[in-house]
Curated annotation (Swiss-Prot):
One Pfam family matching this protein: NADHdh
Annotated protein name in UniProt: NADH-quinone oxidoreductase subunit H
Family assignment from sequence similarity: Belongs to the complex I subunit 1 family.
UniProtKB keywords: Cell inner membrane, Cell membrane, Membrane, NAD, Quinone, Translocase, Transmembrane, Transmembrane helix, Ubiquinone
Catalyzed reactions per annotation: a quinone + NADH + 5 H(+)(in) = a quinol + NAD(+) + 4 H(+)(out)
Any one Gene Ontology molecular-function term assigned to this protein's record: oxidoreductase activity, acting on NAD(P)H, quinone or similar compound as acceptor
EC number assigned by the record: 7.1.1.-
GO biological process, one term: aerobic respiration
Chain's gene name: nuoH
Residue spans crossing the bilayer: 5-25, 45-65, 78-98, 122-142, 156-176, 192-212, 245-265, 271-291, 311-331
Biological source species: Campylobacter concisus (strain 13826)
Bilayer topology annotation: Multi-pass membrane protein
Function: NDH-1 shuttles electrons from NADH, via FMN and iron-sulfur (Fe-S) centers, to quinones in the respiratory chain. The immediate electron acceptor for the enzyme in this species is believed to be ubiquinone. Couples the redox reaction to proton translocation (for every two electrons transferred, four hydrogen ions are translocated across the cytoplasmic membrane), and thus conserves the redox energy in a proton gradient. This subunit may bind ubiquinone.
Keyword Cell inner membrane: yes
Length: 331
């Protein structure tokens, strides 16, 4: 088998595997969130379908597949129908330059668990994250619903504000590692004292907060605040189109957990006797748990509080961090 043919086959296989695994994990994440929140609130959570309620995911999937797909009479049908697709596609597209595991060999061929090892992976992820704003915006505008429209406006304010903060955090990482490749950034962090969480703690905090906004999670969950705007931009959606928004949201959470691990927590480098593959799974799981923990612990912020936090506090801190990093590299 020629190298080119092997490359094409492995790329197709990797794309299918990544899509299947991430879609399955997104479903499992909904179950994990419900159980974690139930435990923290002294409830039982899902427990009726299957052992410990684990088959609740299958029951929910069957329910959503069999629900009627309703389009409001006054909605812009084309935009209304493609908005959920934008959410899911953008979430999966962000995974292309992410190295999930260390490389390994199969029949003498080296397999790299990454779909596209591009040398501008960080820039690519920032670009795809910027595209995510079009999904709630399109859904809110096309739904012809006041709650959806307010939610869309909130989404634009939140996402555009924190894109700048995330950019400042990523710029600090790139300055330290001298690379835009996630593989190079991972390789830079060999040894626990080289983890960028210790060299760039402020950038870590800024990027985590920006990830919460990107994933629409508490305390920055302004677009789906049930007590104010019902279900936000998804109010008029039903069935699998409604589910696609949440597949995109939970895929974003999983992707953000992996990216945070690669950028700041040593990635898949080995630690003591723990192999690299297990390390990235453990660290990403802890970051994902942190997403769930905050939902059970923190209240929502108002829109004006979010904007003030971003533009008056976090952005100046991000710029200051970049300046200090630049001076430190020159010395």
């Amino acid at each position: 088998m020629s190298e080119m043919l092997f490359f094409v086959i492995t790329t197709i296989v990797k794309a299918v595997v990544i899509l299947a695994v991430m879609a399955s994990l997104a479903g499992l994440a909904t179950y994990a969130e419900r159980k974690v929140l139930a435990y923290m609130q002294r409830r039982v959570g899902p427990d009726m379908v299957g052992p410990a309620g684990v088959l609740q995911i299958v029951a929910d999937m069957i329910k959503l597949f069999t629900k009627e797909d309703i389009v409001p009479a006054n909605a812009n049908k084309f935009i209304f129908l493609i908005a959920p697709l934008i959410s899911a596609i953008a979430a999966f597209a962000a995974l292309a330059p992410v190295p999930f595991l260390p490389e390994f060999e199969v029949f003498g061929h080296t397999i790299r668990p990454i779909l596209a090892d591009i040398n501008v992976g960080v820039l690519y992820i920032a670009g795809v994250a910027a595209v995510c704003v079009f999904s709630p915006l399109a859904a809110g505008l096309a739904s012809y619903n006041k709650f959806a429209l307010i939610s869309a406006a909130r989404a634009v304010v939140a996402l555009l504000s924190f894109e700048v903060v995330a950019g400042m955090a990523l710029l600090s990482v790139v300055m330290v590692t001298s690379s835009l490749s996630l593989v190079d950034i991972n390789n830079y962090q060999k040894g626990i004292f080289n983890w960028l969480i210790f060299k760039q703690p402020l950038a870590f905090v800024l990027f985590v907060m920006a990830s919460f906004v990107e994933c629409n999670r508490t305390p920055f969950c302004l677009t789906e605040n049930e007590t104010e705007i019902v279900a936000g931009y998804g109010t008029e959606y039903s069935g699998m189109r409604w589910a696609m928004f949440f597949i995109g949201e939970y895929t974003n959470m999983i992707a953000a957990s992996i990216i945070i691990t690669l950028l700041f927590l040593g990635g898949f480098n080995e630690f003591l006797f723990i192999p690299g593959a297990l390390m990235i799974i453990l660290k990403s799981s802890l970051v994902f748990f942190f997403f769930l923990w905050t939902r059970a612990s923190w209240p929502h912020l108002r829109v004006d509080q979010l904007s003030m936090l971003c533009w008056k506090i976090l952005l100046p801190l991000g710029i200051l961090n970049v300046v200090i990093t630049g001076f430190a590299l020159l010395i």
